[in-house]
Structures are given as C-alpha cells and as structure tokens.
Amino acid sequence: MFELKNVTRRFGKKLAVDSVTLAIAQGQMVGIIGRSGAGKSTLLRMINRLQEPSSGSVHFAGVEVSGLRGQALRNWQRDCAMIFQQFNLVPRLDVLTNVMLGRLNHRSTLMSLLNIFTREERVHAIAALERLGIEQTALQAAGTLSGGQQQRVAIARALMQNPKMVLADEPIASLDPLNAKIVMDALRDINEREGITVITNLHTLDTARNYCERIVGMAGGRVVFDGKPSELTAEAVKEIYGTDKDGAGIDETMTSTSLESKRRAEDVSSGRVAKAAAVH
C-alpha cells in the first residue's frame, strides 16, 4: 500500500500542493489530471523525493518514505522509477548505455563511476528494448532518436530498475497521437504484466479514461475528484478544469491523443476560425 498523508508543498507564499491524502493499493494504474499549475508534477516529485514536502508524510509498505536518508533514500528512488516529459536521457551516449544506467542504484560506487556493466545487465537491457520495440536503436546515440523513441528508451531504463512503482510525469505531452498510444500501451503492459503500480500525470481526459482504472483530479493544489473513469461526470470535469472565458465547459476532444478525436478537434477549430472570419 502506498499512502500520502496530508502532504503539502509551499514555494514561498505559493501553495503548490494542499493537504493531499491518498491511499493507492499495489498494482493500480492511476491517472492524475488537472490544468497546468494544479500541483500534479510537484506531487509526483515529492513521492520520488526529488522535492521535500513542507508538511505531511509519504508512506510505502509501512515505511515512511519522506523520512528516508542516505542509502535508504537511494533504495527508494531505485524502487520508485520516474519517467519525465523531457526523457532525461544522455544524448551523446548510445541507447543501450542509457538503458543500463537504470541499474546504477543496484551497483557498487566504483562500477557505477567506471560505467562497467555486466553481460547479464546488457542482456537485460536489450530485452527491455525488445519489449518496447526499439531494439534496432541500441547502438544509436540517444539524441538522434525521435521523441516517441526517446520516451520508450526512458521506459526501458525504468524497467532496468526493477521498480515496485513507476511515476510518469506527463509522459505523452510532447508526443504525436500515434507515439502517445505506444507509450501508454507500454505503461499499461508494465502495470498488467508485472503488477507494478503506475501513477501518471496526464493532460488528456480520454487517455486517463482509456488507460487508468482510477482517476485523481487536482485543482489549485487540492484533490477535487478521486474515483473510477465512469464516475468522471461533466460536473466533475468542470470542477477540475473550470470553464473557458465564455463560461463553456471543456471540450475533451480538444485535448485528446486519439487520431480521430484530433481530427474532430481540428474540424471544430477550423469551423471557429471560419466563423470568426465571416463575422469580420
């Protein structure tokens, strides 16, 4: 069981995360949604201990993660893999080496400093790349890959950590619909095949509905919705995202990752432009 207990984070006078309490069972796939600035990324960074809570505590399997130091903290960051929107790869290193870097917290300091990897680690890394369908890129410099390929390398690196939990911070925000689907399929496969808890921040409602068994909605740093996708009503969406300047609710197709929804959104946008042009 993973728990957040009244977790708060302040940046000066700004309250980024406000008294968040959640309990997540092992093996769940949870999507966190909300507008930019809602506190989603700050929340994940506190879970991984990249940032410290101003108050409250984080617990996993009965251990207070927010109190860990030294090797115990490094062990937690090994067990709690993090995937970022901007991939966080080393561009000049080849893909295989980038993936094997996921083993750093499993190894001695000397071997880590010298970047010496065992044959078993290389085999494991290639298997992770094969699972993500990008084994052919193993010897390419990571910086030469497309955004979708780089994100799959980041997922393969996370797998190398043998994590108990995977945190994905806006993993598809910069990807086209096809690559977004590939990345989300990979995260769901990890969740279903290994039973690993996956918590992912998403800016697209349809993605959260299609991939996550539980959705948490944040607004102004607080949790304003926590439930199944089927419970995410228009009223709940309005509470999470608010309304536009004309008082209308959010159009889910405008933030969709699906190809069909993208086309519908573009049609709607084109229609608005044409209408505005006709008025003028």
Swiss-Prot record:
Localization, UniProt: Cell inner membrane
Domain ABC transporter: 2-245
The gene coding this protein: phnC
UniProt-listed Enzyme Commission number(s): 7.3.2.2
Transmembrane segments: none
Domain of life: Bacteria
Region annotation (Disordered) ranges: 257-280
Protein's name in the database: Phosphonates import ATP-binding protein PhnC
Task of the protein: Part of the ABC transporter complex PhnCDE involved in phosphonates import. Responsible for energy coupling to the transport system.
Chain positions recorded as ATP binding sites: G34, R35, S36, G37, A38, G39, K40, S41
Biased composition (Basic and acidic residues): 260-269
UniProt similarity note: Belongs to the ABC transporter superfamily. Phosphonates importer (TC 3.A.1.9.1) family.
The keyword Cell division appears for this protein: no
UniProt key word Transmembrane: no
Organism of this sequence: Rhizobium johnstonii (strain DSM 114642 / LMG 32736 / 3841)
Record keywords: ATP-binding, Cell inner membrane, Cell membrane, Membrane, Nucleotide-binding, Phosphonate transport, Translocase, Transport
Disulfide bond positions: none
